[in-house]
From Swiss-Prot:
Lineage: Bacteria, Bacillati, Bacillota, Bacilli, Bacillales
GO biological process: biotin biosynthetic process
Catalyzed reaction equations: (4R,5S)-dethiobiotin + (sulfur carrier)-SH + 2 reduced [2Fe-2S]-[ferredoxin] + 2 S-adenosyl-L-methionine = (sulfur carrier)-H + biotin + 2 5'-deoxyadenosine + 2 L-methionine + 2 oxidized [2Fe-2S]-[ferredoxin]
EC number: 2.8.1.6
Cofactor note: Binds 1 [4Fe-4S] cluster. The cluster is coordinated with 3 cysteines and an exchangeable S-adenosyl-L-methionine. Binds 1 [2Fe-2S] cluster. The cluster is coordinated with 3 cysteines and 1 arginine.
Source organism of this protein record: Lysinibacillus sphaericus (strain C3-41)
Keyword 4Fe-4S listed: yes
InterPro entries: Aldolase_TIM, BATS_dom, Biotin_synth/BioAB, Biotin_synthase, Elp3/MiaA/NifB-like_rSAM, rSAM
Protein's name according to its UniProt entry: Biotin synthase
Cofactor: [4Fe-4S] cluster; [2Fe-2S] cluster
Family affiliation: Belongs to the radical SAM superfamily. Biotin synthase family.
Top EC group: transferase
Length: 331
């Protein structure tokens, strides 16, 4: 398979077939650089060499009634994590200031649970109004399953993006969780879109899914028209259903990132949780397919130090995408 030729066809508007998608995942390691070259051709065409930086604020940790097999915050998990209720508006604002000062363009307010309470949405909404005024950051909320009126309130407050991952294929979903359905997740993304909030939805790779499942989730996100697609790689935490699962290697992770770029050529592809332990020394290559990363810690696991990420981007010759207020402050 000539990956560079397929990449050009994708740029010209082609949608790759399932056979071509599986050929990417099944490609030989000797073909990896050609595959990434093709992925970079697509990425460069739509995004140049800019990289979007994102930071997570874990606004509520633990106490989740859901049974997601990958999650240390699940009701079924025995992982020894820090647990706390929804944080204050002032704490959210303090995190936004850290994001601004560290050249993070998108600030992600994330909370555990099936869905937010009225109070949760009020706190986030009040914080977002001030964040937009003081720092001009793009704000992404990730609060669980969302109702129509909650989506409308978040939109009016200024929330730019809402994250609700599909996580895996429809076929594999019941293996990961039984406390909510695949359709529940799709419906939340559709509600977000209906109310004019940019949809963010992605996947977790390495949860005992097949390669066909990986292709199906990448294609489902294309059909859902998610603007931003976080690609997580399982960090199997002790105490969760998937503890001890080690199905990934760095080369396969790169093939997955390339696949998501070939199937979703115009979208923001973000290398997300688990990149440090699963991509290892090959992390920099991931940005030849992806154009976005998380900086700092994740929800209950540590990330790479921010200075290491900035150095990686500088070594690659990539440029951090700043907000208008950051450009005024730092340029």
């Amino acid at each position: 398979m000539n990956f560079l030729q397929v990449a050009q066809e994708v740029i010209d508007g082609k949608i790759i077939s399932n056979e071509e998608a599986l050929a990417i995942l099944n490609s030989k390691d000797d073909e990896l650089l050609q595959l990434m070259d093709g992925a970079f051709a697509i990425r460069r065409h739509y995004y140049g060499k800019k990289v979007k930086l994102n930071m997570i604020m874990n606004a509520k940790s633990g106490y989740c009634p859901e049974d997601c097999g990958y999650c240390s915050q699940s009701s079924k998990s025995t992982a020894p994590i820090e647990k706390y209720p929804f944080i204050t508006k002032e704490e959210i604002l303090a995190g936004a200031k850290r994001a601004f000062d560290n050249k993070i363009g998108t600030y992600c307010i994330v909370a555990s649970g099936r869905g937010p309470t009225r109070k949760d949405v009020n706190v986030v909404s009040e914080a977002v109004v001030e964040i937009k005024e003081k720092y001009g950051l793009k704000v992404c909320a990730c609060l669980g399953l969302l109702k129509e009126e909650q989506a409308q309130q978040l939109k009016e407050a200024g929330v730019d993006r809402y994250n609700h991952n599909l996580n895996t294929s429809e076929r594999h979903h019941s293996f990961i969780t039984t406390s909510h359905t695949y359709e529940d997740r799709v419906n939340t993304v559709e509600i977000v879109k209906k109310h004019g909030i940019s949809p963010c939805s992605g996947a977790i790779i390495g949860m005992k899914e097949t390669k066909e499942d990986v292709v199906n989730i990448a294609r489902a996100l294309h059909q859902l028209d998610a603007d931003s697609i976080p690609v997580n790689f399982l960090n199997a935490i002790d105490g969760t259903k998937l503890e001890g699962t080690k199905d990934l290697n760095p080369r396969y992770c790169l093939k997955v990132l390339a696949l998501f770029r070939y199937i979703n050529p115009t979208k923001e592809i973000r290398i997300s949780g688990g990149r440090e332990i699963n991509l290892g020394c090959l992390q920099p290559l991931g940005l030849y397919a992806a154009n976005s990363i998380f900086v700092g810690d994740y929800l209950t696991t540590a990330g790479q130090e921010a200075n290491s990420d900035y150095r990686m981007l500088e070594d690659l010759g990539f440029e951090i995408e700043l907000t208008q207020k950051q450009e005024a402050a730092f340029c």
